[in-house]
Amino acid sequence: KKYGACLVGLTLDENGIPSTAEGRFNIAKKIVERAEQYGIKRQDIFIDCLSLTVSAQQDEAMETIKAIKMVKENLGCKTILGVSNISFGIPNRQALNNTYLNLALGAGLDLAIINTEDRTMVESIYAYKVISNMDKGCLDYIKKFKTVSNDNKTKERKNYDNLTLEDVIERGLKEEAKDLTLKILESHDEHFV
């Protein structure tokens, strides 16, 4: 409180991490009540409902999601989660992490601890904000990905000589599709202008 910092509360106690959403919620409630005794506002409290690896505790994966929802609906504070913990020790971690991130966001997750180098995780957050109407007019999404889209089209334009007409059309390269169509027509009909 003295320095204006936020509080992060982990939903574990002397008995460890509860296996149920209700158990984690009860710990979160105690954390919030104790923090308020010290003058910390709910808006400055982040509750971590703790994600555990599905390779060891698969039954608890959805309990974390339920706990996030319970905290958001009943305690009026924010939530935080180390999303990639879910996939530790599992191949194709990216697929699990993205799916779990989307479930957590849907339950009310406010702050995701993720690998920001994993582009698909960042893309998922921007997409979620559009779909959930948090990004009004899709402004942040468009700003973030307009350049990416244009960069991809520029790269594809440079290499379109190696692509078939079907490939060019599937990639949405209108100018290249037109040019390639004219090229194909010219090569098949000497009288085509």
Q: Where would I find each of the regions flagged by the language model?
A:
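ATP-dependent carboxylate/acyl-activation modules
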Residues: 1-43, 52-80, 84-193
